[in-house]
């Protein structure tokens, strides 16, 4: 995970599937679905979002601009990150940094699960 402790405020939201005081694996929280990309919000507030995504092989996200600085954590499988016109293969255990407004796309070359920590301004 990108952080070990998060300060909470009344308007913060932690996904109710994640129970305080219990051990869990991020990779197990979001399922694969045939031919689809599955998304689950883990936590968010007005300054950050933590999102999990599971991509079936061959699926992906079209090119778009990052709304803020972001860190991608490859939890399972393999993908290609197209970033500012250059392809970057990524596999489980590796990470990738996106600058705010950078154009990028994601394409799963095998089944692929990722966590994304997005810093909002």
Where are these regions (language model features)?
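Short, charged/polar surface micro-motifs in flexible loops or helix N-caps
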Residues: 46-48, 56-59, 78, 121
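Short acidic-glycine-tyrosine-enriched beta hairpin
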Residues: 85-100
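Conserved short histidine dyad/triad with adjacent acidic residue
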Residues: 35-36, 49-66
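A cytosolic small-molecule/anion-sensing beta-strand core signal
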Residues: 75-76, 91-92, 110
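Short, conserved beta-strand element in jelly-roll/cupin
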Residues: 54-56, 65-81
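Structural motif
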Residues: 78-80, 87, 103, 113
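A short, N-terminal "cap"/entry segment at the start of jelly-roll beta-barrel domains
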Residues: 1-47, 82
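Ligand-binding loop in jelly-roll beta-barrel domains
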Residues: 100-121
């Amino acid at each position: 995970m990108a952080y070990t402790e998060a300060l909470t405020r009344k308007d913060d939201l932690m996904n109710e599937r994640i129970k305080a005081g219990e051990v869990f694996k991020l990779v197990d929280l979001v399922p694969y679905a045939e031919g689809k990309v599955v998304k689950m919000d883990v936590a968010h507030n007005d300054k950050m979002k933590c999102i999990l995504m599971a991509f079936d092989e061959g699926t992906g996200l079209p090119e778009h601009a990052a709304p803020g600085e972001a860190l991608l954590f490859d939890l399972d499988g393999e993908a290609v990150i197209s970033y500012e016109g250059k392809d970057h293969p990524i596999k489980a255990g590796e990470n990738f940094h996106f600058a705010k407004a950078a154009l990028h796309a994601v394409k799963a070359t095998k089944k692929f699960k990722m966590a994304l920590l997005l810093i909002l301004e």
